[in-house]
Regions:
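C-terminal cap/substrate-recognition subdomain and adjoining C-terminal extension
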Residues: 2, 90-96, 100-104, 111-254
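Alpha-helical substrate-recognition element adjacent to the catalytic core
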Residues: 2-138
């Protein structure tokens, strides 16, 4: 098996943990914070979110409209987020447990890489180790401007899907492995863009009270809820130790 084609299999893990970033690893969503405080505001954002939930507007188009309302230079956006964003209080413990137990963490985000990298480095106090991978959207200049100038940046989507980043694409090659080779695949998320990814994994951790729970209920998709990463850590430890199966966890939550 080539580790180049399947990089998260390089260390032959028994479990791979895929996760959203904003509102999942962070307490609040950094994109929502920027839109509400630096862009057109909470009310308009919620109107567009409702259209996405009702499937009358694609996430890709809605998110681009939201971010386009932010004219603040990109470096100032990052500085603002570094002052205001908080890490889930238990994620750091999960991060080090995963490192010590050969569990790759793969962040699949609809956010932008410079923001995610800056926040992780601040939260952890160092650049993330090799067991943590980030797959997300990028930021590019707008109309030939510098991204650190007024109105100078825009999002560059990871792919052409209506999500802008179809997170399932990253997981499918691992889900397709033969039973004898395939590790347990887990996913944690909170929003609409996590739905495609969740369908490819053995167990979905959906953040309590968020849009992803609503979508799972509507579509009859099995999941278990979490309030913070302490639940995720204890459940993942039990799954890796063979004390419970992902199906058992989802069934108990039903």
């Amino acid at each position: 098996m080539g580790s180049t084609a399947l990089p998260y299999m390089a260390t032959q893990p028994k479990l791979i943990f895929f996760t959203d970033f904003d509102g999942t690893i962070t307490v609040d969503d950094s994109n929502d914070f920027m839109i509400d405080n630096l862009g057109f505001g909470r009310e308009r954002r919620q109107q567009l979110n409702e259209k996405v939930l009702n499937e009358t507007l694609g996430f890709r188009d809605a998110f681009r409209e939201m971010l386009s309302s932010i004219k603040t230079p990109y470096d100032e956006c990052i500085a603002t987020l570094l002052k205001n964003m908080k890490l889930d209080p238990y994620f750091e413990k999960f991060y080090y447990w995963a490192r010590d137990n050969n569990v790759p963490i793969v962040i699949l985000s609809s956010g932008m890489k410079p923001i995610i990298s800056a926040l992780l480095e601040k939260f952890l106090g160092h650049k993330p180790g090799n067991h943590l991978h980030i797959v997300c959207n990028e930021v590019v200049p707008r109309d030939g401007k510098d991204i650190n100038s007024e109105g100078g940046w825009q999002i560059q989507y990871h792919d052409e899907s209506h999500f802008g980043h179809d997170k399932s694409i990253e997981i499918k090659p691992y889900a397709a492995l033969p039973d004898s080779e395939r590790p347990v695949l887990l996913y944690a998320g909170d929003g609409v863009s996590d739905l495609s990814a969740a369908a490819e994994t053995n167990l979905l951790f959906a953040k309590a009270g968020k849009d992803l729970v609503t979508f799972c209920e509507r579509r009859g998709m099995p999941y278990t809820t979490f309030q913070d990463w302490s639940t995720i850590l204890s459940t993942t430890q039990d799954i890796l130790a063979g004390k419970v199966s992902p199906a058992d966890v989802a069934t108990k939550s039903a």
